[in-house]
Every structure is written in structure tokens, then in C-alpha cells.
Amino acid sequence: MSMNLSQMDIPQHLGIIMDGNGRWAQQRGLPRIAGHQQGVQAVKRTVEDCAEIGVKILTLYTFSTENWCRPKSEVDFLMRLAEEYTMQELPGLQRNGVCLQLMGSREGLPVSLLDILDKAALQTKANSCLNLNLALNYGGRAEIMDAMKAIISDHQQGNLEVSQIDEATFSHYLYLPDLPDVDLIVRTGGERRLSNFLLWRAANAVFWSMPVLW
């Protein structure tokens, strides 16, 4: 996928639903994993482009909670691909001033991947050109449910009164509490669905579906 955001108003927070890797591979008679490998190259270009044109926050829908239903071989490959991307791109992220963060549930993710992501987050946390959020093992409903459970727990422990619960308080319990609402959500592949992406933070977002495959 190639994007040219320089000709439109630059969003502060851009979310991308990266769709179409499998179809890209199928059209070329290749296995699905070839599409995922090609998709990583699109990620690299997109991160560089966003850093260059002034996008401050980029959230990529990397692996949804629903993706666990895919064949185990494909899931295992995607986890390894996430590890390889993080390790290989870390020098470039540092060079471009990119801060990398995991956005999603840690439960069920490989320990090796979590270790790599944690180290990358620590090494890049001082970077301020672009915040790159990998929505990995992420689902909008799961995020809201986890926030609700944490709020109930704090209330039961006497740390939070019902009168204190408002939108700002609720947002504080989401995966990345300081993350602002998303301004623009781009979905490649032609589908016109949010697919459980950034449900709480997409209240006022513009949605743009592109026919091009990721």
C-alpha cells in the first residue's frame, strides 16, 4: 500500500486497519504468509511517511482478538513476524524519533514477543516525533470490558466513587490512558467496517475506505 497524506489535512492521530494481505497473495498465486511479509514493507513505508509529514500518533491494527481463530501456523508466523519487525526496525525507529508502544491485551501473547516489545518501548520512550502504537491482540470491545472490570475493582476496593466516573475517568482505564481520540481511520482492502477497532476513541473520527490492498 502507498499513501499520500501530504495533500490533505494532517491528522494528529491516524488509525489504520491493514487489510488485504491475504488477497494480495492470492491474486499472485502465493501463500498468505507472503502477503503478510509484503505487508511489513508497507508498514515501514507508512511509519516513515507519517513521521515525515507530521502525524503525531499512528495506531496500526496489527493483530485482532478475532485473529486467534486463524490457522495456528498462520498465527505463529504472524507472531514471529512481529518479533522480527520490532528487532529489525528498532534502529530506524530511533533514527526517526519514533516511540513504540504495545496497545492490547498481553494475555496469550508469546513471552518472547512481549520481551522484545517491552525492550523496544523502553528504548524509544523518549522519542517524540511519532508515537507508533501496535494494536496487537487488540479488540475494541475487549478494551472496554477490561476498563469496566478495572473500574469495578477500584470501586469495590474503595478507591473510586461512582460519582467520579465520567468519560475522562473511563478513558484513564483504557490500554493507553493518554492516547487521544483518533481523527482519521483508514481501512485498506475496500471493506467499510470498523472491525472492532478503536471503538471508544472513534466517536468523532472520519472513516476512509481505500480499495488498494495493504
List PLM regions with ranges.
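Flexible, compositionally biased loop and terminal segments
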Residues: 1-214
